[in-house]
UniProtKB/Swiss-Prot annotation:
UniProt GO BP: 7-methylguanosine mRNA capping
Stated name of the protein: mRNA cap guanine-N(7) methyltransferase
Binding residues for S-adenosyl-L-methionine: 96, 118, 140, 168, 191, 196
Keywords: Methyltransferase, mRNA capping, mRNA processing, Nucleus, RNA-binding, S-adenosyl-L-methionine, Transferase
Source lineage: Eukaryota, Fungi, Dikarya, Ascomycota, Taphrinomycotina
Organism field: Schizosaccharomyces pombe (strain 972 / ATCC 24843)
């Protein structure tokens, strides 16, 4: 959410004419869509209010999450460079940049539109600008974060149009959140936020229904979530009576004895701490195979999934993403590409995924 999405965001300010190299092999599929104008959003006031019927949430965990992210200050780029987890923030931003470059369309004959669910403070706006998109809508449950995202967008002089809304994509239909002319996108992004939907089956189905409605055939849903396989591995390593694991950077704590299985796959709550980012906030396990199976029922087919550290090992020396690490200053304590120490263990808690919309 306000991590939305990015639990941790960090990157350099944009510079003119700086674009990441764009791989072409990823985008051989045909995306069905209606003709769109370049000024898709220009008839709106960017207030984030048009067409949005405010959804009041009564869930206690949801209120805690919203309050947590609303309370986090937007420190600005320079102050963020002094974060005690700056290497982790840079690494996570590199992961998201890789994900965007691999799966966001790179077409030039029609506008590319993005829906960022759980956009937070707008930490991915620069990434989308570099991807050459034409339109962007960000939605987040934390109203303060949405206002900070609007401010960041205004100050960055982006090459794309954007609107921001305060709303809950996990509890409200997209028809309640967005007006009719703002409900079709080429990419839906869910960065460091989808685990909150797994509080209940209903929320997961509302989310996936919204994603499916927003995407044409060939559109993609991309995201980053905690890796349920890693959670299982740590649970198996716990001694009787132990309920948590982690290090000085991050901690995972179950309120009761950790479950030995993830059935049913919803409502498996734990508390997450990440230094300088998340303070003991309730989150939910996302059993990945259950997620994949439910997504298929909404015509969303898994096309790619990898743990963060596997992405690092596979891409750090590639022609495209290796130099990107250098530019984003993603280096360990010895100056090598990557991440080390306790921050590496924290990064290993996550995976990235991509689904493609099939059918209609």
């Amino acid at each position: 959410m306000s991590s939305s999405n990015s639990r941790v965001h960090e990157e350099q300010p944009p510079t003119e004419n700086r674009r990441y190299a764009r791989p072409t092999a990823q985008m051989n599929r045909v995306i069905e869509q209606q003709p769109r104008r370049r000024d898709y959003f220009q008839n709106n006031d960017n207030s984030g209010r048009r067409g949005y019927n405010r959804h009041e949430n009564n869930g206690n965990a949801q209120d805690v999450v919203r309050s947590h992210y609303n309370a986090r200050p937007d420190l600005g780029y320079k102050k963020r460079q002094f974060s005690p987890i700056i290497q982790l923030k840079r690494f996570n931003n590199w992961i998201k940049s890789v994900l965007i470059q691999k799966f966001a369309p790179h077409a030039s004959d029609y506008p590319i539109l993005v829906l960022d669910m759980g956009c937070g403070k707008g930490g991915d706006l620069i990434k989308w600008d570099k991807a050459g998109i034409d339109g962007y809508i960000g939605i987040d449950i934390a109203e303060v974060s949405v206002n900070q995202a609007k401010k960041r967008y205004r100050e960055m002089h982006a090459s794309f149009d954007a609107l921001f809304y305060a709303g809950d994509c996990f509890s409200s239909s997209i028809n309640e959140l967005l007006p009719p002319d703002q409900r079709k996108f080429d990419v839906v992004s869910l960065q460091f936020c989808m685990h909150y939907a797994f509080e209940s089956e209903e929320k997961v189905r509302v989310l996936l229904g919204n994603v499916s409605k927003c995407l044409p055939r060939g559109g993609v849903m991309i995201g980053t979530i905690p890796n349920s396989d890693v959670i299982v591995k740590h649970i198996k390593m716990l001694k009787p009576g132990e309920k948590e694991w982690g290090n000085d950077i991050y901690k995972v704590r179950f309120p009761e004895s950790p479950p030995r299985s993830f059935r049913p796959p919803y409502g498996i709550q734990y508390y997450f701490y990440l230094e300088d980012a998340v303070t003991d906030v309730p989150e939910y396990v996302v059993p990945f195979e259950a997620f994949r199976a439910v997504a298929e029922g909404y015509n969303l087919e898994l096309i790619w999934v990898k743990p963060f550290l596997d992405i690092l090992n596979e891409e750090k020396n590639s022609e495209t993403y290796g130099p990107l690490m250098d530019r984003m200053k993603v280096v360990d304590n010895e100056g090598h590409r990557g991440i080390g120490g306790q921050e590496k263990e924290a990064a290993g808690f996550y995976l990235a995924f991509a689904f493609e919309k099939r059918g209609i």
